[in-house]
Design a protein with these regions (language model features):
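Active-site entrance/lid segments in N-terminal catalytic domains of soluble metabolic enzymes
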Residues: 1-149
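C-terminal helical cap(s) of enzyme catalytic domains, especially alpha/beta-barrels
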Residues: 33-37, 185-199
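Catalytic cores of alpha/beta
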Residues: 106-115, 148, 154, 159-176
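Residue-level detector of conserved catalytic or cofactor/ligand-binding positions
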Residues: 198-206
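Glycine-rich phosphate-binding active-site loops on the catalytic face of alpha/beta enzymes
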Residues: 3, 19-28, 122-132, 161, ...
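Short, proline-centered helix/strand-breaking motifs
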Residues: 151-152, 205
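Residues on a specific face of well-ordered alpha-helices
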Residues: 11, 139-143, 147, 166-167, ...
């Protein structure tokens, strides 16, 4: 949800009873992230989290600064993605922050559990942006995750409505994670033409 998961989106989701997520790398710097977190707090008194995607790069973002900003801002949930977040776990856990790691396979989910993550977001091949290396759809992936994991997990990828939630719960998840579906909302800073296309081509948006 890069460039879409801003304060408006996160606050709306939290106010509706979900857990809204600000995309940390969208902000780019610790100072801008601190400002976005402050804006979100003005729009909701409910809990919300921040996503940090750890990517290999010759010129990486200021990850230490971003992590410190999250801690100093009092955010209590971080969704990590990309590289193994083990390096950051002691600092986050010491601050009392719950860590949800985004995984595209059962083996990565088990690894996240082993390093102390509180929960995982299990992303099937249906997800937008980063379906992983194995191309496993949720109908196969979620039941296997339920068999292997002791920590809670939410289902991600192709989730859009109440039917998605019922299916996720039936396959062992504790809930579901929606992303692409929210691009069509008024809170998304996306051109209306793109929103309309996502509604017309309702089965293809995550391709």
């Amino acid at each position: 949800m890069h460039y879409v998961g801003l304060a408006e989106m996160a606050a709306a989701v939290s106010n509706a009873g979900g857990l809204g997520i600000i995309t940390g790398l969208t902000q780019g710097t610790p100072e801008k992230l601190a400002n976005e977190i402050a804006r979100c707090k003005e729009m909701t008194g409910k809990p919300f989290g921040v996503n940090l995607t750890f990517l290999p790069s010759l010129t990486p973002p200021d990850y230490p600064g971003l992590v410190n900003t999250i801690i100093q801002s009092g955010v209590k949930v971080v969704e990590t993605a990309g590289n193994n977040p083990a390096k950051w776990m002691p600092q986050l856990k010491e601050a009392g922050i719950k860590v949800i790691h985004k995984c595209t396979s059962v083996r990565h989910s088990v690894k996240a559990q082993d390093i102390g993550c509180d929960a995982v977001s299990v992303d099937g091949f249906e997800c937008g942006g980063h379906p992983g290396e194995d191309d496993i759809p949720n109908f196969i992936l979620l039941p296997r995750a339920a068999d292997e994991l002791e920590i809670p997990f939410v289902a991600s990828g192709g989730m859009a409505d109440a039917r998605s939630l019922v299916a996720s719960l039936a396959m062992g998840a504790e809930g579901m994670n929606m992303g692409t579906r929210f691009i069509a909302t008024k809170e998304a800073p996306v051109h209306d033409n793109v929103k309309q296309l996502s509604l017309i081509h309702i089965s293809e948006p995550t391709r």
